[in-house]
């Protein structure tokens, strides 16, 4: 029986100090990257993981529907965001790696990666939306704080 080669890279698993995360709606701000670099020196473990989400918009019968998956252009855009953030972090002399995760539940995935990699901090941009739009789209920072409140991981929200 032939084994098929996976079409994706294996998820990094080594411990890191900081997870720089985005829910995939916007690129990382320079303030957020600078905050992640500053917090890395406070962490007992060195390194920064850059993580962004390519959102799956729905399922049919428990299977991702091809028309609701992120397009190649969206995935490439998210990859470029991650690469630019990694370049900026590496210019500061800090080890960094990154990944683009495809999921329906961005907050759950970010929390899972932070816990698996034993991070001390998760740094996210604050939500720009106000009022009803914020209620509908959600606030990644407050949702992450709620999800990670019983862990040792501190969520840092950088205001926009």
Regions found by a protein language model. Give the residues of each.
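A structural motif corresponding to the C-terminal end of an alpha-helix
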Residues: 82-98, 148-152
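Well-ordered alpha-helical segments embedded in enzymatic catalytic cores
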Residues: 31-35, 81-84, 109
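General small-molecule cofactor/ligand-binding pocket signal
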Residues: 49-51, 97-101, 154-158
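Structural beta-alpha unit
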Residues: 1-8, 90-122, 160
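Glycine-rich, Arg-bearing micro-motifs that act as flexible, cationic patches
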Residues: 124-147
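Intrinsically disordered or low-complexity boundary/linker segments at protein termini
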Residues: 1-32, 142-160
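A short acidic, glycine-rich active-site loop
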Residues: 67-80
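Small/aliphatic-rich secondary-structure junction motif
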Residues: 10-67
């Amino acid at each position: 029986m032939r084994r098929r080669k996976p079409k994706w890279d294996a998820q990094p698993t080594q411990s890191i100090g900081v997870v720089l995360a985005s829910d995939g709606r916007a690129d990382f701000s320079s303030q957020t990257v600078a905050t992640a670099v500053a917090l890395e020196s406070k962490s007992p473990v060195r390194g920064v993981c850059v993580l962004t989400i390519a959102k799956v918009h729905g399922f049919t019968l428990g299977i991702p529907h091809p028309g609701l998956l992120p397009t190649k252009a969206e995935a490439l855009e998210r990859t470029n965001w991650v690469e630019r953030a990694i370049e900026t972090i590496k210019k500061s002399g800090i080890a960094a790696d990154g990944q683009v995760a495809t999921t329906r539940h961005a907050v759950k995935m970010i929390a899972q990666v932070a816990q698996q990699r034993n991070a001390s901090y998760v740094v996210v941009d604050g939500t720009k939306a106000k009022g009803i739009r914020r209620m509908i789209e959600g606030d990644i920072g407050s949702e992450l704080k709620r999800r990670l409140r019983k862990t040792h991981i501190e969520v840092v929200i950088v205001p926009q």
